[in-house]
Regions:
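Membrane-embedded alpha-helical modules
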Residues: 102-212, 320-422
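Short, non-helical or kinked segments that cap or interrupt transmembrane helices
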Residues: 57-63, 79-92, 133-143, 188-194, ...
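Intrinsically disordered, low-complexity non-transmembrane regions of multi-pass membrane transporters
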Residues: 1-35, 211-224, 258-261, 271, ...
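Juxtamembrane interface elements at the cytosolic ends of transmembrane helices
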Residues: 12, 17, 45-46, 174-179, ...
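N-terminal signal-anchor module of multipass membrane proteins
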Residues: 1-83, 89-102
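Interfacial segments of multi-pass membrane proteins
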Residues: 95-101, 180, 296-311, 317-322
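Hydrophobic, membrane-embedded alpha-helices of multi-pass small-molecule transporters
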Residues: 32-46, 168-172, 190-191, 206, ...
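Membrane-embedded helical hairpins/re-entrant loop segments and their flanking transmembrane helices
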Residues: 18-34, 51-74, 239-308, 426-429
Length: 429
């Protein structure tokens, strides 16, 4: 254990020459390392606090569990893989569906807990059996569609917030876009956070912010924890999120490998297990589910500091913020107009991540099988198809996921059996 928390000081610990990098098992001086850790908190914060705000979860509780999950992640991978675990946007749709049905946060927490357990189980399987079977079950056309529908299914909820205060929503959205295109480096990557701050300031001027809860909140205190309430009927809404979390974690590991020049393929199973365990714990205590964050890859790309020590500092800062109820109360005052503006971009970007999976993997939509199963899945999600069977509810995401998995593999098997699909066709995996 003592070796686990021993990092070699890089150079003089203070300065870095152009192009020089700090490896995961190295660190700068602790003040410099803490500075990098603070940058990681700022980078992840814009996305992390939006998830509880949009779903009705407590921001302080969610932040607390992101800190715990990050620490757990680093412990499990023995400080080899630098990552921060923030709130996953994949949970917004199923949580919203549950709360809209008046089943409450406790029931949604059960869905998060089970999702985490399933992800941890997949992590164990990948660790011992490899990740090839994931590619077989979820080829790019399937993987991309599932990720895309998580975002596009949320489009109606964006409008519900947007129409409350269209002027504030537009100001927020324009601010996010301008920061993204006018600034480079860390500031440009903080476009969501800065845009929300600008939109919030505008909302304050317009008298759209209720500050009453801030004065009643204490400066120091524990977050609000609550136990999950068992309800198996909501699980079909959450199970598809497991596939999204698998895709996010695998993509994250490969991105870090490419950036650091290290082969982290042997860490994929560990990453999935650690994120699954963190999500399970969060669900047990009333926090939102977690995932590895691309925002923090941006910080590493900008600073060239890959030290896992910086992520321990980030987890520490996040923990301290979660223990300030007044801070959580401030976050809860963000008005609907601001949320409508920022989610217009965010939910669309989640959907476009799925499209990017298609593009990067050169999915051939000249093949009828590929384009038909993708088209059906997208319409099911965007149209928000829904039905119930024996008391179990299926929303657009659950139905779309089932349809594309069954349709793709079923039709592929029929096509290959009848000879209409070449068994060696590289475009039909």
């Amino acid at each position: 254990m003592s070796n686990l928390f021993t990092w070699q000081v890089h150079g003089d610990g203070m300065t870095l020459q152009p192009g020089e990098v700090v490896e995961p098992d190295e660190r700068l001086t602790w003040p410099r390392t803490a500075e990098i850790g603070a940058q990681h908190v700022i980078a992840m914060f814009g996305a992390t606090f939006l998830v509880p705000i949009l779903t009705g979860f407590d921001p302080s509780t969610t932040l607390f569990f992101t800190a715990m999950s990050t620490a757990l992640f680093l412990l499990i991978n023995k400080n080899v893989l630098p990552s921060y675990l923030g709130s996953s946007f994949g949970f917004i749709a199923p949580i919203t569906a549950v709360t809209t049905a008046n089943k409450g946060i406790a029931v949604a927490s059960f869905g998060i807990l089970v999702t985490g357990l399933l992800l941890a189980l997949i992590g164990v399987l990948v660790h011992f059996a490899g990740a090839k079977w994931i590619d077989i079950i979820m080829p790019p056309v399937v993987n991309g569609a599932i990720v895309a529908i998580i975002g596009f299914n949320l489009a109606p909820s964006v409008w519900n917030n947007f129409k409350v205060a269209p002027d504030t929503a537009i100001v927020t959205l324009v601010a996010v876009l301008l920061v993204a295109v006018l600034f480079k480096g860390l500031i440009g990557r903080l476009n969501i956070l800065i845009g929300v701050i600008i939109g919030y300031a505008y909302a304050c001027i317009r008298g759209q912010v209720d500050f009453s809860a801030i004065g009643d909140a204490a400066w120091v205190g524990l977050p609000t924890f609550h136990l999950p309430q068992v309800d198996f009927t909501i699980l079909p809404m959450f199970v598809p999120v497991v596939l999204v979390l698998v895709a996010e974690n695998v993509g994250h590991v490969k991105s870090v490998s490419q950036m650091t020049g290290r082969d982290y393929d042997d860490q994929i199973g560990t990453a999935l297990f650690a994120d699954g365990l963190g999500t399970t714990i969060a669900g047990f205590g009333g926090g939102s589910g977690t995932t590895t964050y691309g925002e923090n890859i941006g910080v590493m790309a900008a600073t060239k500091v890959y030290s896992t020590a910086a992520y321990w500092c980030a987890a520490g800062f996040a923990l301290l913020l979660s223990l300030c109820p007044k801070f959580g109360a401030i976050i809860n005052t963000i008005p609907a107009g601001v949320l409508g503006g920022v989610t217009t971009l965010l939910y669309g970007m989640i959907g476009m991540v799925g499209i990017r999976i298609w593009v990067e993997n050169k999915v051939n939509f000249d093949k009828p099988l590929n384009i038909m199963v993708a088209a059906i899945t997208m319409i099911i999600a965007i149209g928000q198809f829904a039905f119930a069977f024996n008391g179990i509810s299926f929303n657009g995401i659950a139905i779309g996921t089932i349809v594309i998995l069954v349709a793709y593999h079923g039709l592929k098997a029929i096509g290959k059996a009848t000879g209409t699909i070449d068994k060696n066709d590289p475009d039909i995996l």
